[in-house]
Amino acid sequence: MEHTYQYSWIIPFIPLPVPILLGVGLLLFPTATKNLRRMWTFLSIFLLSIVMIFSLYLSIQQIFVSCIHQNVWSWTINNEFSFEFGYFIDPLTSIMSILISTVGILVLIYSDNYMSHDQGYLRFFAYMGFFNTSMLGLVTSSNLIQVYFFWELVGMCSYLLIGFWFTRPIAANACQKAFVTNRVGDFGLLLGILGLYWITGSFEFQDLFEIFNNLILNNRVNLLFLTLCAFLLFVGPIAKSAQFPLHVWLPDAMEGPTPISALIHAATMVAAGIFLVARLLPLFIVIPSIMYIISLIGIITVLLGATLALAQKDIKRGLAYSTMSQLGYMMLALGMGSYRSALFHLITHAYSKALLFLGSGSIIHSMEAIVGYSPDKSQNMILMGGLTKHVPITKTAFLIGTLSLCGIPPLACFWSKDEILNDSLLFSPIFAIIACSTAGLTAFYMFRIYLLTFEGHLNTYFINYSGKKSSSFYSISLWGKEEEKKLNRNFGLVPLLTMNNTKRASFFCKKTYKISNNVRNQTFITVENFGLNTRTFYYPHESDNTILFPMLVLLLFTLFIGAIGIPFNQEGIDFDILSKLFTPSINLLHQNSENLVDWYEFFRNATFSVSIAFFGIFIAYCLYKPFYSSLLNLTLLNLFQKWNSKRIRWEKLINFVYNWSYNRGYIDAFFKTALIESIRRLAKQTNFFDKRIIDGITNGVGITSFFVGEVTKYIGGSRISSYLFLYLSYVLIFLIILFFFYFEKF
């Protein structure tokens, strides 16, 4: 066992050869490297599989013998300072390594097909390999300096992958927004690290915790300064895990390829902030005010993310806000001191949300054959609908992921979210009400996404599919923007844009690529409607096996991964794997309880949380099930149609919620007005002062000297005698002034 731990330092470097060899190969042998591109994919998957096996082996050992292994090498710079670097293996490290490697492998398999038509295929896999190395280095770091180094590398990889299609202005702006927002958090993290080193004199986690606790117990340090340093440490995770108010970058990050959204912005990178708070929890836990701030930020993010997801039209942005809300649950659990619940939800959410993102990518991939290669159209849920019979496997996988996130048993997220809701009841009634209400909102917006995408008919080909008697309709311009138009009621179908279905554009050059034959030669389907028009249209098709296989594996994880943490304890014996891993575990809410959850309490709380979820699903079903169905006869909907006054109030409420959600809670607008515009004005004023005042003085002195020299040159007439005469005249004037000054003094 000790022999295994000695070689754990190699874990972060196993995926590193692929990006290095790809970079060298593309520089020196570009043609050969591109011709062997499938080999690089296989090599990436193979190396990450080694990491997964290694991590699984470490986890199995720690289940039976829970221990912490740390190995440190010291680099002495001088007698007063030495830099130590090494690796730190504990249950948290092994779990995160398994999570990174398993999701990473599935995303790489998925990406092989998803990115096959992109000219940046090799660049994509190089970035992915470098990201996996950075993330593994982060979770195995033994001190704060190493954490910060890999933290920055993870941010750089995120910047590169969000802006992967950098020729699109919206993607370029999105990666810059993510970079700048995370720099705010990273600066706070750096200040916190330096402050802690100034107090404790160490960067190592174990030494840091011991010294910090001793200082607190003996009152040998200013508590206010300690609190400030701890808060600055927390600012980094706020930005990285998209917590309020530094969450604004996450929805825009969806401009990157969909596999990136599944790996980085659902399962791993955004979880890095949760990981760091969990790693530093022994430090935070001795400062109650910091724990309360962590829980407060978490509960605000939980509610804000859920409300902002309510009216999103882009399927990936809706899932992004859902991710933000679920990360808020994890942060809330950590702030309450429920270490196990937070990490349990981190695991279950990672697999469920990765499944949903890969499912959305499969849908987008299928819609591109219909609406063309435009994210504004292929990701717009308003143009989807009726996909159940066209993509049945994707639909089933997406439904399982949706039910899991809603908290429906026995799926993965039910077990972890239920623990957090139970702990919130013990922590604060107000927090519990917000957390439980948000569970209902989660079920509502997730089923809204599902119903808009899969139920009804394909809305791309239909007008007036909302069922309203008088309405204006949205047509799609050539560039994917919605334009409001009044359409003729005599026509039952929206005329399609003229599209060339034999070619697919690339963002990087004018060359086009043919779409595979299974897209071109798909069966034509005739849609008859209103008796007047019979037209022939394309319909989406199921994705290829290399896209479906990772989704099916994640579906199995979503079904069964919750079993590792089912909280059934009897006679002091832990039956779940997580309890064996996290021994001893930090739990401030169950300090005096031998059995965390008994049968009666579990079923009572589970019944309550599941009832809330089903209520949210029911409301979503009533509002978003296609209006041409029999649901119009439901009493709930007829109430709003019969009572005009209540209907007006209801519509005002709906419009308020819609505007709040669609405009991102006006937070982006506030930042733009209060920060961005102010900084721009300051920059313009600084630029004016620098160029007109500072440069003006410098240039004025130079120009004055030049003119004085020119005047002197012409007065002297280019003769030495004239220069001597002027020189002596100036000396005489100077002596006269000096004489009068000296005479007046005496």
Swiss-Prot record:
Keywords: Chloroplast, Membrane, NAD, NADP, Plastid, Plastoquinone, Quinone, Thylakoid, Translocase, Transmembrane, Transmembrane helix, Transport. The keyword Cell membrane does not apply. The keyword Glycoprotein does not apply. It comes from Lepidium virginicum (Virginia pepperweed). Its main location: plastid. NDH shuttles electrons from NAD(P)H:plastoquinone, via FMN and iron-sulfur (Fe-S) centers, to quinones in the photosynthetic chain and possibly in a chloroplast respiratory chain. The immediate electron acceptor for the enzyme in this species is believed to be plastoquinone. Couples the redox reaction to proton translocation, and thus conserves the redox energy in a proton gradient. InterPro entries: NADH_UbQ_OxRdtase_chlpt_su5_C (IPR002128), NADHpl_OxRdtase_5_subgr (IPR018393), ND/Mrp_TM (IPR001750), NU5C-like (IPR003945), Proton_antipo_N (IPR001516). It is found in: Plastid, Chloroplast thylakoid membrane. It holds the Pfam family Proton_antipo_M. It is a multi-pass membrane protein. GO terms for cellular component: chloroplast thylakoid membrane. GO terms for molecular function: NADH dehydrogenase (ubiquinone) activity; quinone binding. Belongs to the complex I subunit 5 family. The gene is ndhF. This is NAD(P)H-quinone oxidoreductase subunit 5, chloroplastic. It comes from the Eukaryota. The chain crosses the membrane at residues 9-29, 40-60, 89-109, 125-145, 147-167, 185-205, 221-241, 258-278, 280-300, 327-347, 354-374, 396-416, 425-445, 547-567, 608-628, 723-743. NDH is composed of at least 16 different subunits, 5 of which are encoded in the nucleus. GO terms for biological process: ATP synthesis coupled electron transport; electron transport coupled proton transport. It catalyses: a plastoquinone + NADH + (n+1) H(+)(in) = a plastoquinol + NAD(+) + n H(+)(out); a plastoquinone + NADPH + (n+1) H(+)(in) = a plastoquinol + NADP(+) + n H(+)(out). Its EC number is 7.1.1.-. It is an enzyme of class 7 (translocase).
